Amino acid sequence: MAATAPPRPGNEIGRMTGLTLFTPIRRQWLPLLVLAFWMSWHAKVFNRHILQFNFIKFVRWTIVRDLPGEDLNYAYMLFESNFDGPWQHYIDAFAYVIPKDIRLTWGRGINFPHPPPAEPLKAWIARNSMEGGTYYCAYPEASTRMVRSALEVRKRVGALARDAERLGPEEFKAAYERFLVDAQAHL
């Protein structure tokens, strides 16, 4: 009898992984984080570092000051994200590409290891992460890049279809060949 495979964690579906962290924030740093999050929401230039990673499908930070029925000693930061591949690779990118952003966001928290290197950060995340209770991914077998490429091809096919109504056969042939060349990077 063949051994059964171990169950997959609830935060993995297809090639996607969800990561949820719930970490305390030191009181004296709460106003700085509130300001930083407000600025990132209202001035998108502050999001450019996190948005450079094309493997991220979703990312959100929330400051939690209270919970119904619970007296919290600290405000907490709830971090939620989903991305292509294992979380360890995701954290490598954070630790080495945007370490200042990571230190600003979590560096004022308790026992934060201040990357780089990535290994202490991974250990800290492993201690502070929570398995997702609910996790949804519309295209679990597709990477973020695949989904973005498919959306771009769909947009270009739509433009070609609109143009086709007014083009003659030779013009359409030329437009179709341009479409194939232009869309090639997304196929």
Regions found by a protein language model. Name each.
Residues 63:
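Short beta-strand
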Residues 84-119:
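An amphipathic, aromatic/His-enriched active-site/gating alpha helix that lines ligand/cofactor pockets
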Residues 1-57, 66, 73-76, 82-89, ...:
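Short S/T/G/P-rich N-terminal loop/turn motif that feeds into the first structured element of a domain
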